[in-house]
Design a protein with these regions (language model features):
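Alpha-helix C-terminal capping segments
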Residues: 52-60, 103, 279-285
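Conserved phosphate-binding/catalytic region of the ribokinase-like
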Residues: 189-190, 217-328
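Glycine-rich phosphate/adenosyl-contacting loop at the front of the ribokinase-like
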Residues: 1-64, 70-74, 328
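Conserved N-terminal subdomain of the carbohydrate kinase-like
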Residues: 32-33, 56-137, 318-328
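Short beta-strands and strand-loop turn motifs
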Residues: 109-111, 136-142, 182, 200-205
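Charged helix-capping and loop-helix junction motifs
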Residues: 123-126, 150-157, 215-221, 256-259
């Protein structure tokens, strides 16, 4: 991770990356031999998706996390082939997950368990995170495997390890590092006190946090604003075919409907929105409307394809999106 002092970098953190084996089966039948109509193998994990889409959009990032065994080596190989930089911790015991994703009259997933991650492995990750500089962006997303502490998000966001200068307990936001959190339930709500730069719940996750049912964008806005009052600087809520809502730290509420697309695959669409938001934010020198547009377009481009969003498709969809100011 060598670079010049002051050079900004995006880091993505995936605790349990996977090899995703995606198969299409016509009329799947339980207890019988089924033949695949199509199949592919791709690196899996929310943070990895963000890194791959950033690469597709022309932005560099460094993928962090834990890998193990032959599957871990395959994940890293494929990421590098897609243009991503990597700086993983390779753990000794076990192998990285193999997840089966089957498409047959709907989507079915069978996810593996992943390797054993030791306290020593965690210490190595924390050491890597100490090297982050002011202006960097750290994307933390996805679930926590059972071999990691339940408060792993908070440990990272609090950056509690002693700094080389001898200053303990320096938080990421206090160091000028912008954290992006894309997680569910208490993982998300417990992160708010660390003032993440961006959080991205989807509509279903927002409903789960507050125990409500939401349908319209104007119904989403007050709950997004509650999360902002709890500490998030910017709140981006994805709503599938209903579009998205962004509550910004500048006091604006932006809404947009999704461009008319035929949804092919929803896996990775939310991660693509995060990547697009960051790409748009950096390309516009911090303009939130531009970030919002690019995020929604990238998410839609992934949903309309069996592949993650590419630049050309994203830009075509971006031209079809209209942003308006939201109100309750």
């Amino acid at each position: 991770m060598r670079r010049e002092r002051g050079q900004q970098m995006i880091y993505t953190l995936t605790f349990s990356p996977s090899v995703d084996y995606i198969v299409e089966v016509d009329h799947f039948r339980v207890g019988e031999i089924n033949r695949t109509a199509a199949e592919k193998v791709v690196p899996g994990g929310k943070g990895l998706n963000v890194s791959m889409v950033l690469s597709n959009l022309g932005h560099e990032s460094v993928a962090l996390g834990f890998l193990a065994g032959f599957t871990g080596r395959e994940i890293e190989k494929r990421l590098r082939e897609s243009g991503c930089r990597t700086d993983f911790i390779h753990v000794r015991e076990g192998f990285s997950r193999i997840n089966l994703k089957m498409i047959s009259n709907g989507e079915t997933a069978i996810n593996g368990q992943g390797p054993k991650i030791t306290p020593g492995d965690i210490a190595k990750l924390e050491k890597k995170l100490e090297r982050l500089q002011a202006g960097d962006i750290l994307v933390i997303s996805g679930s926590i495997p059972n071999t990691l502490p339940e408060d792993m998000y908070e440990r990272i966001l609090a950056a509690a390890a002693d700094r080389p200068e001898g200053r303990p307990d320096i938080r990421l936001d206090g160091r000028g590092i912008r954290a992006v959190v894309d997680a569910e339930g208490h993982l998300l709500t417990n992160a708010l006190k660390y003032h993440p730069f961006l959080i991205k719940p989807n509509q279903e996750e927002l409903e789960g946090i507050f125990g409500v049912h939401l349908e319209k964008q104007e119904e989403v806005i007050p709950y997004a604003e509650m999360l902002q009052r709890e500490g998030a600087r910017n709140v981006l809520v994805s709503m599938g075919e209903r579009g998205a809502v962004l509550v910004t730290e500048t006091g604006k509420v932006l809404c947009a409907g999704a461009p008319g697309i035929r949804v092919v695959n929803t896996v990775g669409a939310g991660d693509s929105m995060v990547a697009g938001f960051l790409a748009g934010y950096l390309e516009s020198d911090g303009d939130y409307e531009s970030a919002f547009l690019t995020g929604l377009a990238a998410g839609s481009a992934s949903a309309a394809s069996t592949e993650l969003a590419a630049r050309q498709e994203m830009e075509a969809l971006r031209k079809r999106i209209r942003v308006h100011m939201g109100s309750v």
